Amino acid sequence: MSSHYEAPIRKPLVTGNKSYHDVSVDIAAAIEGKANKQWWIVFSIALVMFLWGVGCMIYTISTGIGVWGLNKTVGWAWDITNFVWWIGIGHAGTLISAVLLLFRQKWRMSINRSAEAMTIFAVIQAGLFPIIHMGRPWLAFWVLPIPNAYGSLWVNFNSPLLWDVFAISTYLSVSLVFWWTGLLPDFAMIRDRAVKPFQKKIYSLVSFGWTGRAKDWQRFEEVSLVLAGLATPLVLSVHTIVSFDFATSVIPGWHTTIFPPYFVAGAIFSGFAMVNTLLIIMRKVSNLENYITVQHIELMNIVIMITGSIVGTAYITELFIAWYSGVEYEQYAFLNRATGPYWWAYWAMMTCNVFSPQLMWIKKLRTSILFSFFISIIVNIGMWFERFVIIVTSLHRDYLPSSWTMFSPTFVDIGIFVGTIGFFFVLFLLYARTFPVIAQAEVKTILKTSGDNYKKLRDKK
């Protein structure tokens, strides 16, 4: 009993007096039942957004990237803004799965599966932007170090854009393996419950012959720990490499050593906000309030509050170093952000990312589901503006006043971005109907320590 003991002060992580069988039934319900009206409405909207985005991508590829709002001064704009934003959103999944696993945090078990799915779907969206940004996406394979017949013809390993290729591909592959490994016992549970022969065959195939023997569990736990060890450095390295796209250049406002930690903190910040957005909706639609509790939402809000404070500190540090450096160009770059033509984007960023998360210090607000949902949306809007401010305001006024200009997005820029949001939700909604959205095998392991009925029984003794 002592090895399973949990202090009474800790709130239960599973409510509703659940048994092992109840957990299986509740999590399999979304897969075994029929989609409700709300699911079809949201899926239809997401599909229309996705198709609009596909149309804009086809138009871009067939006509050229001149259909975007780019000009000779602002060569990177919405494409790279959206790329960095999507990559950042993916970071929370790896952090919840890998880092919290290594720290043995039990509250991760109800949210890690959907957070990992979000990571993979976000990285897919991010990967689209560098490909279409090339202008000739049919030559995208040129950025891969493929052996060729030309001997010394090789990729430029000094290019940060090549580092992005390695970062994204490594991140996607490790996240996918980690996600699928965790899914094996859950797929096996769906397989064993399946009534239709075709469904049974599909889930048998994807569960890789899982039987639930002690040897299966031993290997499962070993592989999970090894993959967590591999994925933890990726949380830091991927967004660090993305920050090098900017930090290794000589543009004022980009050439700064604070970018790697600043980008990583911002990525975790926006990622947790997106996890909150998705899980608050999912817990309501899929009747999972007993598994994704207010306790989970509150803990994620605390992470958002802390990382928001780190991001705010980074903003202030940037301003201080620009002044302290004595470099006129650096000072102007930051002054222009706050008071120039794009002042509205800068102050939207500051309001959303620095001021709004500080409201989470108030317990009543951070335990409010409605307020948490509102703040999670605000934070993601703010993080998009942060990337826009970093990229566009640094480029539109550089060293030569004669080349100063403004950037305005076209309907194609907007369409591609809206399309990726639609694609993301199409993937997530299909996932919610075909995959177990909560790691039921892991939730069952904490039922006797963190389940409310067991805690009540123990307290009575």
Regions found by a protein language model. Name each.
Residues W86-I96, D164-G182, A265-I280, A348-L359, ...:
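Hydrophobic cores of alpha-helical transmembrane segments in multi-pass inner/ER membrane proteins
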Residues K106-W107, W361-S372:
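Membrane-helix interface "capping/anchor" motifs
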Residues A29-M57, N148-Y346:
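Long, contiguous internal "core" modules enriched in hydrophobic/ aromatic residues
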Residues I251-H255, V327, L365-R366, I391-F411:
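Extracellular/periplasmic helix-loop-helix junctions in multi-pass membrane proteins
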Residues M1-Q38, F141-F157, D186-E222, Q295, ...:
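Extramembrane terminal tails and long inter-domain/linker segments of multi-pass membrane proteins
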Residues S2-K18, M57-G69, T73-W76, F83-A214, ...:
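Transmembrane-helix bundle segments that line or gate the permeation/cavity pathway
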Residues F371-I381:
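Central hydrophobic cores of alpha-helical transmembrane segments
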